[in-house]
């Protein structure tokens, strides 16, 4: 009996998709697919980053099991140090900040990203007058929110062209560098997997 043929190694994109599906739990998880970012792979983990000014600046936290996140951060830092670089983690979640509290990593809050639980949306709106005002204005302006089908996002579709135009106008209206890599818009890559 012949030994089984080994499966081909997963490509980097396939590995990332698998890690995002298993461990993608925050705002920046899908940014691992954005152009211009490097990917560091650990064992069953990955971190997207860019090299800036002697640092590896990570985009969000690691894609890994939550209980392994501190170990993964330390492995990433060791890899950066081998290249003469320090590390900075930008756009991480509060649970990760809490996990590093008793380590030699430091944390500093720079800003907040609004995050809501869709199951609790009615309570969120009830408790936020500014949000209610913005939603009312959007409604008066005829803006609606709905889930798009994959067909509507196909290359050449009117919806996709409109979304591209809106995204381009937004990006051109912002002064993005030096942290522009945090807001690169690659709206349609792996759109069938985005939630």
Short names for language-model regions:
Residues 3-57, 62, 85, 90-106, ...:
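A conserved beta-strand-loop-helix scaffold within acyl/acetyltransferase catalytic domains
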Residues 110-121:
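A glycine-rich helix N-cap at a beta->alpha junction
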Residues 66-78, 87:
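Conserved acetyl-CoA-binding loop-helix of GNAT-fold acetyltransferases
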């Amino acid at each position: 009996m012949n030994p089984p043929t080994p499966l081909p190694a997963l490509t980097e994109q396939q590995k990332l998709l698998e890690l995002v599906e298993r461990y993608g739990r925050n705002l920046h998880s899908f940014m691992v697919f954005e152009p211009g970012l490097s990917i560091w792979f650990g064992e069953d983990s990955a971190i997207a980053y860019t090299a800036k000014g002697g640092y590896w600046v990570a985009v969000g936290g690691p894609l890994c099991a939550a209980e392994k996140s501190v170990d993964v951060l330390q492995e990433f830092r060791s890899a950066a140090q081998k290249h003469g670089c320090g590390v900075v983690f930008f756009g991480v979640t509060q649970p990760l900040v809490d996990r590093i509290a008793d380590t030699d990593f430091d944390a500093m809050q720079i800003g907040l990203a609004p995050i809501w639980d869709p199951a609790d949306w009615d309570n969120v709106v009830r408790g936020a007058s500014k949000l209610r005002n913005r939603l009312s204005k959007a409604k008066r302006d005829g803006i609606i929110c709905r889930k798009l089908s994959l067909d509507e996002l196909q290359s050449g579709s009117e919806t996709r062209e409109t979304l591209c135009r809106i995204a381009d106008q937004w990006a051109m209206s912002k002064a993005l560098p030096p942290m522009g890599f945090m807001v690169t818009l690659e709206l349609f890559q792996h759109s069938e997997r985005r939630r």
